[in-house]
Amino acid sequence: MALSQGLLTFRDVAIEFSQEEWKCLDPAQRTLYRDVMLENYRNLVSLDISSKCMMNTLSSTGQGNTEVIHTGTLQRQASYHIGAFCSQEIEKDIHDFVFQWQEDETNDHEAPMTEIKKLTSSTDRYDQRHAGNKPIKGQLESRFHLHLRRHRRIHTGEKPYKCEECEKVFSCKSHLEIHRIIHTGEKPYKCKVCDKAFKHDSHLAKHTRIHRGDKHYTCNECGKVFDQKATLACHHRSHTGEKPYKCNECGKTFSQTSHLVYHHRLHTGEKPYKCNECGKTFARNSVLVIHKAVHTAEKPYKCNECGKVFKQRATLAGHRRVHTGEKPYRCEECDKVFSRKSHLERHRRIHTGEKPYKCKVCDKAFRSDSRLAEHQRVHTGERPYTCNECGKVFSTKAYLACHQKLHTGEKLYECEECDKVYIRKSHLERHRRIHTGEKPHKCGDCGKAFNSPSHLIRHQRIHTGQKSYKCHQCGKVFSLRSLLAEHQKIPFGDNCFKCNEYSKPSSIN
């Protein structure tokens, strides 16, 4: 839409409302009208000359809603009022004047001299309109009404644009186009400094601040600096504990909108991020990125101390604390400190008694998912850890580590009372109770106390009647693994029968 010499007036692009029409607009729509008109004015002034002419300033006169456009070039102004609206407008005969831009012959990039000349004739504008160009006023008026329609959807909730992949709906076409990038994986915005690519221009803009070193916003509490005001606002909530974003489904609150969005997907089951290799879907893009490392075997994060590599930056950060000894996470109940937040959360369950991970076979509950996974191997018989020395297999990595000490002769834990040594610290602690007589594990049903938790668990099955160990030959179940082992030593088959009364296999001599 380049027009040489800019033979165009402000009234050509003005959108005028009658008094009745103006009264129908709410304050937000009036503000939108003003913003669009000012943008149109900038576009008009800069036609065909790029940045050589810009509007100098827009300022409030302090008198009601009056706004004044200062250009430094337009001489005569007059006010007109439409209802509550008052705007300084270029006098109605401004169409007799026009900007005439004259290029500086010596430097093509300098701002040119400007003059206000008489409009040559109205025929020029007529010829321009009939030369195949759409009138600029019509284009800008259409643009204003487009903005207005889009704004009204905020109030009506209308979302006419639908994603074909996941059927999510949007109020703006541009928002749909941005969303589609999630499915395509396209990253069209590239950093000119380091070639890193981004899905959104806003993410690129944020990234470029890293190269510029911009950090303008400082936290008054801890002195930490941020390159974005919004990031500082989120950070402030870590000090105040504020969680203003609430889930309508379960009432859980969050400090950031993004965390609420991720949480909502637990209720909806939405997983918009798809792996192109195996088709697996994820609720978070960050989890997809981590998953992709499974296919590539890529481990880009390396520890400078020991050279160990990791798939995730967070895992590397946790690993570094092994070298530094840093334990920033403290339990409020007992003041015990931990190097990882997940370890603290798991520890807290000791105080709360919470056991959120439940076995589907026997309904036994555990404090951590890793303990549940280990327990489930009791039912499946899986033993994935093999000793390289003797080929013996184990259900947990810890059992294998203890077993391997038998081959190395390593016995680290020694009793000061009787000089007995153990390959596990827990075994030594349990042994010490023989000398001290301590029995810290008490039955809640009968009050009987035991020196080890395993003995208490075994005892509690007397009260509950729980029998977790099943014989795969005859189907009989036992409360103790040792009883199952004894039972399995009895030959079963031709030399054995099953008593219908007691369901006890008996051998026949």
From Swiss-Prot:
It is found in: Nucleus. One of its GO terms (biological process) is regulation of transcription by RNA polymerase II. Expressed at high levels in placenta, pancreas, kidney and heart, and at lower levels in liver, skeletal muscle and brain. GO terms for cellular component: nucleus. Residues 8-80 form the KRAB domain. SMART domains: KRAB, ZnF_C2H2. SUPFAM superfamilies: beta-beta-alpha zinc fingers, KRAB domain (Kruppel-associated box). A zinc finger (C2H2-type) spans 161-183, 189-211, 217-239, 245-267, 273-295, 301-323, 329-351, 357-379, 385-407, 413-435, 441-463, 469-491. Gene3D superfamilies: 6.10.140.140, Classic Zinc Finger. One of its GO terms (molecular function) is RNA polymerase II cis-regulatory region sequence-specific DNA binding. It comes from the Eukaryota. Keywords: Chromosomal rearrangement, DNA-binding, Metal-binding, Nucleus, Proto-oncogene, Repeat, Transcription, Transcription regulation, Zinc, Zinc-finger. The keyword Cell inner membrane does not apply. Belongs to the krueppel C2H2-type zinc-finger protein family. May be involved in transcriptional regulation. It is linked to A chromosomal aberration involving ZNF320 is found in a form of glioblastoma. Translocation t(10;19)(q26;q13.3) with BRWD2/WDR11. This is Zinc finger protein 320. It comes from Homo sapiens (Human).
